[in-house]
């Protein structure tokens, strides 16, 4: 039910199972449906601090509060109870976050990584891609090909920003990129074969054509935020190595960084080969990192630094042994899938850096 609501932000009066999938049916405008969902979510969130339920509750209450003038007296009383429950649950999440502490893995400090002629980089023009490219280049890596995907006409997607965040307040011993440096400039140092595509999407046919499976052992993947890789690219290109911002299988889905800060007091990252099932590919490495210190940008800089560190760990293993780390297969019924975090919970998570 959480999944259905998170995807559509609607609660329907009926659902049916059709062809193995749950389909929405019936009315979705009755506020009693949202009140009842809110009550169920509040109960689930109070029973063990279940963050997916709290996140959905906050979004459900946004809908209810926007329609408050349309509620009758009984419905307003139920809404008032839910708002009191929301305040308790958010405060409990804040206190839980303040007491969270987790093991932190040391940074990767590899020497000269060397040449990887059968490895390519697929990089959307984002801050994270700049971090990956600079981390590899700074440690002496060269690749067989780099494919850069840009937005036509200067448009922007998730993961892109006109203003690069400052790294002046960074306090840990990780490689820190200069995100002002254009991606193309760094990629020219990584490979003699740089292809730039103005497709605006990873899922264009030209992308898969540029990264054939018979030419490369695998492709380091850094796409646009929020864009899922389509089946055609997965089937036609060499395997895509992705640094997921979450400790798998515990944290699948979206904005898992912030949920992890709330629950564990740490940032997890997992190196996986992408598969058709979201965040369920084989795992080749995992590391835990501290949340950002006060003054450090969490959306772009912190994310780029720590995912780049995991990438360096994987590539250092390949350089040293001639093989990627051993694969760990995930089970579909393990872990948790998260959805875009509500701004209230995101703010609490960000404050973890202020207290670090």
Please provide the spans of the model-predicted regions.
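One-carbon transfer enzymes
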Residues: 10-55, 59-356
């Amino acid at each position: 039910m959480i999944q259905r609501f998170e995807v559509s932000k609607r609660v329907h009066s009926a659902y049916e199972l059709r062809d193995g999938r749950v389909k929405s049916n019936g009315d979705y405008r009755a506020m009693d449906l949202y009140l009842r969902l809110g009550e169920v979510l509040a109960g689930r969130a109070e029973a063990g601090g279940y963050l997916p339920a709290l996140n959905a509750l906050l979004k459900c209450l946004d809908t209810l509060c926007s329609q408050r003038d349309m509620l009758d007296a009984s419905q307003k009383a139920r809404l008032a109870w839910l708002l009191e429950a929301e305040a308790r649950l958010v405060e409990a999440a804040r206190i839980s976050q303040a007491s969270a502490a987790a093991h932190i893995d040391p940074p990767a400090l590899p020497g000269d990584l060397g040449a990887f002629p059968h490895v390519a980089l697929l990089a959307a023009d984002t801050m994270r891609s700049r971090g990956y490219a600079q981390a590899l280049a700074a440690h002496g890596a060269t690749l067989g090909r780099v494919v850069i995907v840009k937005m036509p006409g200067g448009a922007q997607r998730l993961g892109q920003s006109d203003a690069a965040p400052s790294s002046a307040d960074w306090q840990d011993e990780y490689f820190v990129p200069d995100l002002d440096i254009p991606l193309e400039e760094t990629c020219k140092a990584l490979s003699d074969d740089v292809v730039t595509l103005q497709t605006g999407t990873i899922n264009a046919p030209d992308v898969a054509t540029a990264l054939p499976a018979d030419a490369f052992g695998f492709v380091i993947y850094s796409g646009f935020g929020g864009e899922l890789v389509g089946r055609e690219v997965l089937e036609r290109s060499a395997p895509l190595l992705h640094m997921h911002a979450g400790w798998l299988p515990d944290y699948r889905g979206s904005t898992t960084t912030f949920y992890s800060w709330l629950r564990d007091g740490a940032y997890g990252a997992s190196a996986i080969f992408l598969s058709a099932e979201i965040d369920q590919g084989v795992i080749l490495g995992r590391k835990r990192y501290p949340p950002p210190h006060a003054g450090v940008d969490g959306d772009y800089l912190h994310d780029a630094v720590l995912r780049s560190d995991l990438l360096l760990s994987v590539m250092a293993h390949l350089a040293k042994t001639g093989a990627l780390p051993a694969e760990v297969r995930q089970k579909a019924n393990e872990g948790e899938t998260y959805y875009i975090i509500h701004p209230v919970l995101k703010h609490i998570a960000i404050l973890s850096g202020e207290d670090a």
